[in-house]
Amino acid sequence: MKRSIFAPNLIKNAHFYKIEMKKVVYFLLALVVVGLGACDNGPKFKVQGEVTGAADKMLYFEASGLEGIVVLDSVELGSDGCFGFVGARPESPDFYRLRLDGKVVNFSVDSTETVTLKAEADKFDTDYVIEGSASNQKIKELVLLHGELQKKVDKLSQNRGIPAGIAQQTLSNLINEYKNKVRKEYIFSAPNTTYAYFALFQTLNGYMIFDPMANKDDIKCFAAVATSLNNTYPHADR
């Protein structure tokens, strides 16, 4: 069989093609690396701090989005309990949280601030110190107020000696007392803040405390916050 006069050229062209393809691949990889570097150089916020008594435990950094909780990063804490996370600056104020052994600390971020948290592992979600934003101190106050309400409701439900009618009235009084305080001190006083928004969506045993579908006064709370935040952040998703 005669050897084709085109064979050497085909082999030569194939070799040339492989070389060129390698160049293209390297070029594309370089573009990806540069692109990732460019994304990584965008505005950031930091979350850092220390959790004592939490050696070898996992600490999770999560986003509290409209579609649910998303884990952004995690770290296994060392003996010193120090940690640090970095996140891309949100386009508008958004909510995040740190989770340790099922205990959660909620906080908000609206710029490139540094949020610093110090806590003990066994009191992670109740006795923590958070710095870097006045809103986050208010969110902590709301969490503690809610915790006190939950304790009172739990105690009431465990008292089997109270007639059902009295128990129901007592429950309503507890909830209304809580709502009046939050409405006055956290919602209407500063409706354009993240903590006012946070207050609206707290729940009690699975039910919304402020329920715009069942209470006309609650509608006013939602309207005040929605109007204020929309004026301040017209392009926000929330």
Across the structure, where does each feature detected by a protein language model lie?
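Bacterial Sec-dependent N-terminal signal peptides
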Residues: 1-50
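A non-transmembrane, solvent-exposed segment enriched in polar/low-complexity residues
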Residues: 39-185
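Inter-repeat boundary and helix-capping residues of tandem alpha-helical solenoids
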Residues: 176, 188-189, 193, 218
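Amphipathic alpha-helical repeat scaffolds
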Residues: 184-188, 201
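Amphipathic alpha-helical repeat scaffolds of TPR domains
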Residues: 192-207
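Short coil/turn connectors between adjacent alpha-helices in alpha-solenoid helical repeat scaffolds
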Residues: 208-218
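N-proximal helix/coil linker or "cap" segments that precede and/or mark the start of modular domains
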Residues: 219-238
